[in-house]
Amino acid sequence: MSDNEKTTQPASTDSTEPAYRYNAALAQDIEGKWQKIWDDKGTFWAANVNGDLKDGKGRNADGRPAYFAMDMFPYPSGKGLHVGHPLGYLASDVVSRYHRMKGENVLHAMGYDAFGLPAEQYAVQTGQHPRVTTLANIANMSRQLHRMGLSFDDRRSFATIDPGYVRWTQWIFSRIYDSWYDEDAVNPSGSKGSARPVSELVAKFESGEKAIPGHESDGKAWADLDQAEQQDILNDFRLAYISKSPVNWCPGLGTVLANEEVTAEGKSERGNFPVFQRELRQWSMRITKYGHRLIEDLDGIDWPEKVKLMQRNWIGESHGASVHFTVATADGSKDMEIYTTRPDTLFGTTFAVVSPEHHLLENVPAEWPADVPEDWKGGYATPVEAVKAYRLAAEAKTAKDRVDEGGEKTGLFTGLYATNPITGAKLPLFTADYVLMDYGTGAIMAVPGGDQRDYDFAVKFGLPVIYTVKPLPESGDDLANYEGKAPFVSHDGIVINSSVEATAAKGDALSLNGLRVDDAIAKVNAWLESAGVGKGTVSYRLRDWLFSRQRYWGEPFPIVYGEDGTPHLLPDSALPISLPDVPDYEPRTFDPMDAESNPEAPLSRNEDWVKVELDLGDGKKTDRKSTRLNSSHITRSRMPSSA
């Protein structure tokens, strides 16, 4: 007699246990019996409108109400599930069963977010190939989920490493890459702004309907530009584009990390390695183009107001102006664009600051200008030495450390000067790590009379402070309470010290004195646009999404490069581009403290896969997409019409 049979027999007369005691073994028998019945009858099967996927009664969808229940996919980066997984799955299972009992056609399926750093790191730690460990972990997780009795339609289970899923991930990337955001496009709802094919943008350039950036005054037509020039221009419009971006470089892991993968201490979440800020060539998604739409669409969702407010603040829409300053260098005048929410304070700008990653720092002079205070130089003999050392120091800090309000304000003079387009004043140009390259333009105009951070910086380096706003008369406050002690920080007040008889850009008179702040902003924005040195614009705290990694375990980009380095999109017929099985899949790692090291993608060592001969060109891209891209279309791939 088996142990199970023994536990289901009546207890003997001398036993203290009740007959047919409900214990773990009996529970397992009952669960196993009903799970087999559910499997045999297809109790949890969802029916498609047509095709082979029918419900347990052999029916296609027949007009019954449809209900879609979705769970967050587990990462198969460990041998099995942990206790946190069923916490969410049980809740969605209760909801699914409720709607199924109401007679609805319920689609409730499970999948596995199988690419990415966690799965690859697990494989490295266990000394196996990621595909081997991932498939083994998926099999065990599937067994565990089934054993829990959750009402999934297992016929529809998939993993993000499946070729069919990879194909659609790459197809989605192709559509994003081949699109641009047309702010003037009219949507069916009457609103403006929509993604349009890049071919339409090219047609606008060819017809002259849209000016070609950088060629507004030289008369060049689109056909006059070579292919590389055309692609550089289109790259500035594509929704998926190549950028030189400040990134979290982790030499110890040999890869770039997302902000979420970096701890508050500036270490990698995996392995606890130091993380440095580096500027590298990366793939980015132009999500900032959708900033305003994201805010507007929050009104249409049934979320708590507190959560929606957090989202609005995270997107961070602000209205201001972009302003162009001229910077004189040995290589000629260079443009420095800044974004400010307070263009009315342009008269109070006494210095400017750029990020350590800013391109202008490639043009610093060989020697210090005359009469530069010693504390501006940071102890260095030349601007070149000073900038190089400061850049290295900035790389060792996280973005969070750099913008910490309580931290010490560091910086040094670059040897360059920027010209104020209104007053013509020569503003010393500093570099400071509290200015981030991927926020705004990586350059700021400093107004110490109206900003605490600028005031602290000005005091430290002995820079002048000009107040351009005074309190309203009815406020009971007085500017004398601030002068020489602190900035007057207020969006409202009366503008002062803001008049010039002849502007630097136009030679006309301009005065903002006596105006309220909002009126002064409107007036100066109009002047900036008329002078061709700026315009009113909108900026976002939200940043474009960097989504490439120098790892092996992920989908390759469907991009090849020509001999001239020009990227070409592979046709849909070539998809999916699958990962080759390689013996050496680990990225090259470096000394964890080697901030100057450069990433080496594992696939770059696979010459047979990297080099291809096509009419498009040769040299397949060796970066791959991060896990977040293949996770972000899970909903669509599981919808009934897509199954």
Regions of interest found by a model, annotated:
Residues S2-A27, G32-K33, I37-K41, T126-M336, ...:
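Residue patterns forming the tRNA-binding/recognition surfaces of aminoacyl-tRNA synthetases
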Residues D52-T134, F158-T169, I338-T341, T345, ...:
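N-terminal catalytic cores of NTP/NDP-binding nucleotidyl/phosphoryl-transfer enzymes
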